[in-house]
Structures are given as structure tokens and as C-alpha cells.
Design a protein with these regions (language model features):
Chain A
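Cytosolic juxtamembrane amphipathic/interface segments immediately preceding
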Residues: 56-58, 320, 396-397, 489-500
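Aromatic-capped, Gly/Pro-kinked transmembrane alpha-helices
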Residues: 416, 427-524
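Transmembrane helix-loop-helix hairpins at membrane boundaries of multipass inner-membrane proteins
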Residues: 1-6, 10-95, 170-172, 434, ...
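Short aromatic-rich membrane-water interface segments that cap or initiate transmembrane helices
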Residues: 54-69, 176-180, 360-370, 439-444
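Membrane-helix interface motif
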Residues: 41-50, 163-169, 343-358, 420-437
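Hydrophobic membrane-spanning alpha-helices of multi-pass integral membrane proteins
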Residues: 336-341, 406-423, 483-489, 511-512
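Hydrophobic transmembrane alpha-helices and their helix-loop junctions in integral membrane proteins
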Residues: 80-116, 125-398, 403
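Alpha-helical transmembrane segments and their helix-start/interface "positive-inside/aromatic belt" motifs
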Residues: 21-31, 142-147, 151, 327-334, ...
Length: 524, 496
């Protein structure tokens, strides 16, 4: 049977022949529905499609519970983005969206490393063209940066794959027995692990906001899925690294004031939560990690939608220029509140359930208090956003464009879905077929859910002057770019020795002969 | 069956007839050239399709005794070059039909001389003939480089001539030394007689062979003629050079090394290691130098040097998997480079220059050609599902299987470096229309069909090979047998 991601890729191919926007939308919608149906109906834990490449057997369709759950949320979210971006997505980006989302979904259902690598790179290439803009120089360079860093990760993954293949002789997607370092390096870039995270804020803060909504949901989550499938350590190292990520992401985010940069850094922090979940060995925490991934896509999407709508209606994205918007954009404000409370893990909001699950699975006090601290930080960040964007009266930006109905509808739909899941844990458990033995609404877990938010609310007036907004540039050089530039300087030297002088060239070839002869004479 | 010798005779006959036709009636030149390359291609495909029944095949000129006669051999290893020839020659002749506008007779004459030389080098089993065909190839190459009569092409041709001649001296020296040591020039007799020589003598012989042919397949630092030569020549020559001629020279060197000296000698006396390290150096150097280039052709020239590095690495592993991977990449790189050069030629029609900054905005004018460009560049980096991934996978697998971890890592690193400069091409082509807003360049009206076909066909092949690399690996599956085991080669003519 068909891999659930393939309908989208076929739709992308079909779309090339139709220039009409409506038809392309129709194809995309149809493909997403088909893939949802496939995911819900196909039998699990069975090889459903295979192919061969050279002398290797590829497993093209193998559905496990976690991949099914992530896949469902991937296609649901794509539907929501299509609604939100109905008036914004360009004709070309619809095609690329199909390939991007299609390969993100397809990668979840393959069972071997070759096809895994194939879709891994396809995601990168599709994202490159999504980011790329012929007319804008900045976007051209960001796209270049994006693809270079991701291909670096991809090649590292490839090296790991081939080391493992050479060692074990098979390419089945299981925790590798050799070359684990290269797998981890490749995945770390994809998930934007602390230190490799620079592409996240760069990309998501600069591209058109409707694309940021889309892209932010997939790339790093695919990385988390890969980590879950591939990396299996004896220790809880990943969980502690995840904690580091959760706290580091907050430190990075809190001092920024560009809306989408803040949200991007907070992705890093939220990824940390997921890593804590899947890095632990017990079932509850792992389920919680995957569940958090699902929730995260929803509320992070909503946050990006909120930021996008603010930008669309006021033309500003930096908190220094915003303020007093709550009356002018009530729907956006509502979405902002729901998203903030969800990301903060406030009880009866979307993020609460998965955070409670992760906390229930923790086995050390350090992790528990670390995550609570991260919760305080997260709450603080988004209280800051809400305050400076909607409530504070310093600025009073005008509404230059009323956001179209589709954007508001998209935000309302996603908020409604989030609230539905938050109020109906039994339903969500049925949809995702998870059965944790955790009482979500016991007194202690509600208390530990409320705590961080309350602390943050109390701290905010005290810390306000330290984290108040300031103007900033979106694109800054980082370590990787400096490395690149130093390499280019080396290149210039190499280029310069090619002077075009014939005598020099002749002497090079004679020198080569001489060295060869010397090697033979001396070694012999 | 006289088919193999026809591969030499047909272009040779074309050369002489071209002279006559150029004198009497010019309108027959094109049909003649097309017919002759079509015939050659048919012969090549005959061998490719009947490889199981007809090969290995030896042809004895003049029916002398096998050990005295000049022999021509077509075995499974020869198929590697045949595959490239079958795909590239006809397509490049087709492409040249509109590219060459003046002095057609001269151009096709030189081109056919080149075909004579390459076909001869690939098939001959006689060292002296090898040298003759080597010189035929070289001299026609020098002339073709100078063909455009521009300052830059004349200067490049002069440099190429100088470097080529110096290297040819070493090749000749090596052949003479071999003859003095063994008393024969028959390639099947040399192996056992060379075995008695002291190790050092054999090593020095190898050094001479390496330098002599190394200039031609552009191993760093003997590569210096290549980027210069590529700038001022017709696209047809660019394609033929990087897809066929360079490969042929390397092919011959490998045959000499593995057949004459044997795998054990090469591995026990550092030759394999030297080649391996040299290949890595060549690859990294080529990638690094390509970064700074503004001229598209020069950049692709450096990229060819780097890609040859991969081939050298693969071949120097000395395992069947390595030879197979190297052969695969040789053919595959020919396909990719062919496609990209044809596409570059098409872009040049509209842009009027090969400078990257002058090519800005071409994507708006030629969307399909630009798409081909992007596809092939991604393939060169090794991004699936294009054929570049298959060859990179094969090389990596082979080198790890042979226990070489570092070379494999370097290949990964090299691929990463190559992404940097390939991206700069893409970004230049896909920059918004700024140069062409007021004066649209000439030639936008449309490409002729013969300019579209070659690039399209090769791109299609590249995509198909990406999904089904087994098509090509099946074709060359037995190539390693005839390279790594001397006896297989020797038995084609004597014994067996």
C-alpha cells in the first residue's frame, strides 16, 4: 500500500501541469485527506510496500504507532495552514508545500536508512526553494545558509548510515551499531540543538510569515522523530541534554524583541522538553515526549500565526513598535492568550497534558525542577510578548490592513482544536491510542502546572526593565558563517597561485615527478 | 567479425572524406558526420547489448600470429568507456550542428581525428599503437582548444601543447623503457616479463606512466591546462573532454598499472596508497579552487578535476567493488557533466557570457534549462534520488569495505565543499531579472531542437539512473574481472 506521504508528492507533480490556484488547492486538500485516511486505516507494524535499490531492500511503508500519531498531526496541521494561508500562499509555494509536507510525512513511514536519507534530503531541498526568493537578496542568502547547514547534517547522517551498513550489512532503520556520533551530529542540526540552532531564528524570522508557520512545524520535529527512532543510549544523557536545551533556549529567547525570533528560540526550548521525554527509558516519559511534539506543533503554529497576523495588520514585528493591540485585534489577542497558556503548560490548556505526562515519567529531582524552571522561563517570555504587543500603552500602531477571514478562521480553528484536546483527554488518547496510567487532573499535577505560570506572573513586573524590547537586526553572523568565510580566504590563496605562468605550471608537473621518484627512492 | 576496427576506421574514413567534401560540396559535411557517428554509436551499442555472448573479443590485424600482431581487444572493462562514448559522442555531434558556424569542415575533421584517437586508445593491446593514438588524441585536442581563434583559446592551447608535450615525453620514455626491459610492445606479453625486474625499476616506470598520462586526466598539480583550456572552446569540446577524453586517459593508465604490474605489486609497494592520497588531494584541491571562479566554464573545469579525484580514489582501492564504483562514477560523471555543459551552452546563448554575474536572472528567461541546471548540480552533490547519489554511495561503500575510513570521510567533506560553489551558480541564475530589463539579449527567441535534446536526454538518464542504478552496474558488472586479474586479460589473446 501507498506510503501516506506519497499522495502529496504525486499531488506536487500533478500541480506542475495546472496553473490554476483553485485546482492546486483542491489537489493539496485531496492529497492531505487521502494521506490522513491512509494513516488511520492501514494496519500497523507490517511491511506494506517495498522496493529495491542496488542490492538493498527498501521498506517504503511501515506504520508504527508513534509515526502514525506524528503523521496525523502533520497532515492536520498542513490542512490548518492551508486555511490560514488561503490568501497568502503563492502558486509556486503550493507545489513546494506539497513536496515539503509530503516528504516530512513520508519519512515517518519508511523502514530503511536509504529511503530515510532520501526524504531527509528532499525536505531540505524543498525547504530551500520555499525560503528562496529571486527578488530578495537576504532571503537568497538565508536559503543558502539553510541548505548548507542541512546538507552538512545530511552528509553526516549519510556517513553514519554507510558506516553502519558496512558494519552490520543491513539498512533497516534501527538504532545503529556503528557511527552513532555521525547520526547524532546530523540529527542535532536538524532539531536545532543548542550550538547548532543558528538556522532556526535566522530562517523563521526572515521568511514570509505564512511560510514560517508552515516550516516551523515540520523540520525540527522530523529531527526529534529521527532521534526517537535512531538514537538509543543506555543512559539518560539525552534527557539531561534536553534539559540544557530547554533552559538554554529560554536564555536565548528572553532578551530578544523581534516576535518571530522569540518564538523561534522558544522552539529550541520546547524541543528540549521533547528530548527530556524521549531521552528517558520509561514508557510514560517517551509517550509524553511524542505527545508533547504533537501539542507543540499546534501551539507553536498558533503562535506563529499570531505573530504573522500582527505583522500583516500593523506592518511591525518588533515589540518596540507594538502595543495596545488587544482592542483592535481581539481574535489575535484571544489566540495569543490561548497559545501562551498552552505553551506554559497551564492546566486545562493544550500543553498541560503532555507536560504532565513527561513530569510523571521523570525519575530525578534535577530534571523535575529544571523543567519547572524552564516552565517559568517560557511563561515569562510569552507574558512579555502578550504584555508588550497587546497591553502596554507605550505605542499605538495603526491597523493598515484587516486580516482576511481565512487567517482569523485558521487561528480560531486551531485554537478550538487545542481547547478540545485539552478538555477531552480521553478523546485525544483514543485518537492517538496512548494509554498512560496517569491522572492528569490530580491536585498535585494541577498545582505543578499552575506554579510556573504564577511565578512568572509575579516575576514579570520585577524583571520587566531587564527584558524590555529593543531594536535588533534579524541576520547576524554566527560561528558557522565565520568558519565558512575563513575557508573562503584559504580558497583565495589557492586561486592566487594559479598565475597563468607556463613556467610555473611546467615546474609543478616536474616537481610532481620528482616527488614521486624521491618517495620511491627513499622508501625503497 | 570486423566490428571493433570499424570504430577506428569509420571516423578515419570520415576525416579523409571531409577533406574532399569541403573542397567540392560543403552541403554533405553534416550528413556525413552524423552518419559516421551514428554508425559508431550503433557498433558500440551492439557490443553493449551483446556483451554476454560476444565479449571478450579480440581482433587480430592482418591475421598474424597473436603474439606478433597488432591486437585490438574489447572486453568488459572496455565497456566502461564504451558506455560513455555511446551516450556522449552522438549527442555532442548533434549539439555541435548549430554551435559551429564557421569552418565546419575543419572542426569536424578535428573532432573525428579525436574519435579515432580515443577509440584506438581504449581498444589497442599494443603499447606503440597506444602511444600513436595518444598523440592523435592530444594533437587534435590542442587544435580543438585553439579552434575559436580567440586570444584566450590560443594562449590556452599553447599552454596545453607545452604541458602535453612534456608529459608525452615521459610517456614515451616509459614505453621505451618497458620495451628495453621486456623486448616486446604487446600488452599481453609484457606482464610476465616485467615481473622479473627489480622493484625500484618498476616503481620508476610507474612514475613515468603516471606523470605522462596524469597531465591528460588533470590530477593536481598537473591540472593547470584544464581550466584555462575550458574557457575558450566550443561546448562540444568541453563535453567531450570531461566526459570522454579525460576518462579515456585515466582508463588507459589503470589498464597499464593493473595489467602490467598486477594488484599485489601495486599494493605492496605503496603505489595504491600514493594514488589514494593523491586522489584525495586532487579532489579537495579541485573543490577548493572551484570556489573562487567567476567563469562558469572554468568553475566546471575545476569541478571535473575534483570529480576525477573521486574516480581515482575508487580505482586505487583495488577491490572489485572499488573498480565498479569508480567505473560507475566515470560514466555517471560524464552524463552529469555533459548535461550541465550543454545546459550552460544554452544559457550562454541568452546571456552572451559565461561570467556568473552576467548570468543573473537567466531563470526567468530559460526556466527549463535552469531547472536542468539545478537538478544536475544537486545530483553532483549527491542528493538522492539523482544518479550522483548512487555513485557516491557505491564509492563510499567500496572504500569502507576496503577498510579506508578517512578517504570515505574526505569524500563526504568534498561533497559538502562542492555544494558551496554549486549553490553560487544556482543563486546567480535564480536572481531576479535585473540585467535584462531594458535590453533583452539576442537568441531568446528559442533554442533549436538539436540544442535542447542533448541536455534533456542526459538529464533523463541521470534521473533514471538515480532510481535504477542497477541498469548501469549490470552493464559494467564484470569490468573488475578484466582489470584486477591479469590472466583474464592475457587469455583473451594467448592461451585459453
Amino acid at each position: 500500500m501507498l506510503n501516506p506521504g506519497f499522495p502529496l508528492i504525486f499531488a506536487a507533480l500533478l500541480c506542475f501541469f495546472f496553473k490554476s490556484r483553485k485546482i492546486r488547492y483542491l489537489f493539496t486538500f485531496g492529497a492531505l485527506i487521502i494521506s490522513l485516511v491512509l494513516m488511520l486505516t492501514l494496519p500497523r507494524n507490517k511491511i506494506l510496500a517495498a522496493a529495491s535499490f542496488l542490492d538493498m531492500e527498501l521498506i517504503l511503508n511501515y506504520i508504527s504507532l508513534s509515526s502514525r500519531n506524528i503523521g496525523i498531526i502533520f497532515s492536520l496541521f498542513a490542512l490548518l495552514v492551508l486555511i490560514y494561508g488561503y490568501r497568502l500562499l503563492s502558486l509556486a509555494s503550493l507545489n513546494l508545500l506539497n513536496i515539503f509536507v509530503g516528504s516530512s510525512i513520508a519519512i515517518l513511514f519508511v523502514g530503511d536508512f536509504i529511503s530515510f536519507f532520501f526524504f531527509w534530503e528532499l525536505i531540505t531541498v524543498a525547504a530551500f526553494f520555499l525560503v528562496y526568493d529571486k527578488m530578495k537578496e537576504k532571503l537568497r542568502y538565508i536559503a543558502e545558509y539553510y541548505i548548507i547547514i542541512h546538507v552538512l547534517g545530511g552528509l553526516s547522517l549519510l556517513f553514519g548510515i554507510i558506516l553502519n551498513y558496512n558494519y552490520t550489512g543491513n539498512i533497516i532503520l534501527t538504532p545503529p551499531e556503528a557511527g552513532l556520533v555521525f547520526f547524532i551530529f546530523g540529527i542535532a542540526i536538524k532539531i536545532g540543538f543548542l550550538g547548532f540552532h543558528a538556522w532556526i531564528p535566522k530562517t523563521y524570522a526572515a521568511i514570509p510569515f505564512q511560510l514560517a508557520v508552515l516550516m516551523a512545524a515540520y523540520t525540527s520535529k522530523v529531527g526529534v522523530y529521527a532521534l526517537y527512532r535512531i538514537v538509543e543510549l543506555e543512559t539518560n544523557l539525552i534527557a539531561y541534554l534536553g534539559l540544557l536545551n530547554a533552559l538554554g533556549g529560554i536564555l536565548l529567547a528572553i532578551f530578544h524583541s523581534h516576535l518571530r525570533i522569540i518564538i523561534s528560540y522558544s522552539i529550541i526550548s520546547q524541543i528540549g522538553y521533547m528530548l527530556v521525554g524521549i531521552g528517558l527509558t520509561n514508557n510514560i516519559a517517551v509517550t509524553g515526549g511524542i505527545f508533547h511534539l504533537i501539542n507543540h506543533i499546534l501551539y507553536k503554529g498558533l503562535l506563529f500565526m499570531m505573530a504573522g497576523t500582527i505583522f500583516y495588520s500593523t506592518g511591525f514585528e518588533n515589540l518596540t513598535d507594538l502595543g495596545n493591540l488587544w482592542k483592535k485585534t481581539p481574535v489575535t489577542f484571544l489566540a495569543g492568550i490561548i497559545a501562551t497558556l498552552s505553551i506554559a503548560g497551564f492546566p486545562f490548556f493544550n500543553g498541560y497534558l503532555s507536560k504532565a505526562l513527561i513530569k510523571a515519567g521523570l525519575d530525578s529531582q534535577l530534571l523535575y525542577y529544571g523543567l519547572q524552571l524552564a516552565g517559568v522561563g517560557t511563561s515569562l517570555i510569552f507574558i512579555k510578548v502578550l504584555y508588550f504587543a497587546f497591553l502596554c500603552k507605550n505605542n499605538n500602531p495603526d491597523i493598515i490592513k484587516i486580516p482576511p477571514l481565512s487567517m482569523r478562521l485558521g487561528m480560531l480553528l486551531i485554537s478550538a482544536f487545542m481547547m478540545l484536546t485539552a478538555w477531552n483527554p480521553a478523546g485525544i488518547e483514543r485518537l492517538f491510542q496512548i494509554t498512560p496510567a496517569v491522572d492528569y487532573f490530580s491536585g498535585s499535577s494541577i498545582f505543578s502546572g499552575i506554579m510556573p505560570f504564577l511565578i512568572a506572573l509575579l516575576l514579570f513586573p520585577l524583571l520587566k526593565k531587564y527584558i524590555s524590547p529593543h531594536p535588533e537586526k534579524v541576520f547576524q553572523r554566527d560561528f558557522f558563517m565565520k568558519l565558512g568565510y575563513s575557508f573562503i580566504n584559504l580558497d583565495k590563496k589557492i586561486s592566487r597561485i594559479h598565475s597563468g605562468d607556463l613556467i610555473r605550471y611546467l615546474s609543478w608537473s616536474l616537481l610532481a615527478l620528482l616527488i614521486l621518484l624521491m618517495v620511491f627512492l627513499l622508501a625503497g | 567479425m570486423h566490428l571493433p576496427i570499424l570504430l577506428i576506421i569509420i571516423p578515419l574514413f570520415t576525416v579523409f572524406s571531409l577533406g574532399l567534401f569541403a573542397f567540392f560540396s560543403k552541403k554533405y559535411i553534416i550528413p556525413l558526420v552524423l552518419t559516421s557517428s551514428l554508425l559508431s554509436t550503433v557498433i558500440i551499442f551492439f557490443f553493449i547489448f551483446n556483451r554476454e555472448t560476444k565479449l571478450p573479443f579480440s581482433y587480430n590485424l592482418g591475421s598474424w600470429q597473436p603474439d606478433l600482431a597488432i591486437n585490438i581487444i574489447v572486453d568488459h572493462y572496455t565497456l566502461v568507456i564504451f558506455a560513455a562514448m555511446g551516450l556522449i559522442t552522438l549527442l555532442s555531434v548533434i549539439y555541435s550542428l548549430t554551435e559551429i558556424t564557421r569552418n565546419k569542415a575543419k572542426f569536424y575533421l578535428l573532432l573525428n581525428v579525436l574519435f579515432v584517437g580515443t577509440a584506438g586508445m581504449v581498444m589497442t593491446a599494443d603499447l606503440f599503437n597506444l602511444y600513436v593514438f595518444f598523440e592523435i588524441t592530444s594533437i587534435s585536442s590542442y587544435a580543438l582548444v585553439a579552434y575559436n581563434d580567440k586570444d584566450i583559446s590560443l594562449e590556452a592551447a599553447f599552454k596545453y601543447l607545452m604541458l602535453g608535450t612534456v608529459s608525452a615525453v615521459f610517456l614515451l620514455l616509459a614505453i621505451i623503457l618497458t620495451y628495453m626491459a621486456t623486448g616486446t610492445l604487446n600488452m599481453v606479453l609484457i606482464p610476465e616479463r616485467l615481473g622479473n625486474l627489480p622493484v625500484l625499476t618498476r616503481q620508476i616506470l610507474i612514475a613515468f606512466y603516471l606523470i605522462g598520462l596524469g597531465v591528460k586526466f588533470a590530477i593536481v598539480p598537473l591540472h593547470t591546462w584544464l581550466p584555462d583550456a575550458y574557457v575558450g572552446v566550443p561546448i562540444t569540446y568541453n563535453v567531450l573532454s570531461s566526459a570522454l577524453i579525460i576518462k579515456t586517459q585515466f582508463f588507459v593508465l589503470m589498464r597499464i598499472l593493473y595489467i602490467f604490474f598486477g594488484l599485489n605489486f601495486l599494493q605492496n609497494n605503496m603505489i595504491s596508497t600514493i594514488l589514494l592520497v593523491w586522489g584525495i588531494f586532487s579532489m579537495l584541491f579541485g573543490h577548493a579552487a572551484a570556489f573562487q571562479q567567476n567563469n562558469l566554464k572554468r568553475l566546471l573545469g575545476y569541478s571535473t578535476i575534483a570529480q576525477m579525484g573521486y574516480v581515482i580514489i575508487a580505482f586505487s582501492l583495488g577491490t572489485p567493488a572499488g573498480i565498479l564504483a569508480g567505473s560507475f562514477h566515470m560514466i555517471n560523471h560524464g552524463i552529469m557533466k555533459g548535461a550541465i555543459f550543454f545546459a550552460a551552452g544554452n544559457l550562454h546563448k541568452a546571456a552572451g557570457s559565461y561570467q556568473l554575474d552576467k548570468m543573473q536572472g537567466m531563470a526567468d528567461i530559460m526556466p527549463k534549462t535552469s531547472l536542468i541546471f539545478v537538478l544536475i548540480l544537486l545530483s553532483m552533490v549527491g542528493i538522492p534520488p539523482l544518479s550522483g547519489f548512487a555513485s557516491k554511495w557505491l564509492i563510499l561503500e567500496a572504500s569502507l569495505e576496503a577498510g579506508y575510513l578517512l578517504p570515505a570521510f574526505m569524500i563526504i567533506l568534498g561533497s559538502f565543499l562542492s555544494l558551496g560553489y554549486y549553490l553560487s551558480i544556482i543563486i546567480n541564475i535564480y536572481t531576479g531579472e535585473k540585467n535584462f530589463s531594458d535590453n533583452l539579449p539576442v537568441g531568446v527567441a528559442g533554442l533549436k531542437i538539436n540544442e535542447i535534446i542533448p541536455a534533456a536526454v542526459l538529464t533523463a538518464v541521470c534521473i533514471v539512473l538515480g532510481f535504477y542504478p542497477a541498469v548501469l552496474t549490470g552493464l559494467i558488472a564484470r569490468a573488475p574481472e578484466f582489470l584486477l586479474q591479469q590472466l583474464n586479460f592475457i587469455n583473451i589473446i594467448i592461451g585459453g
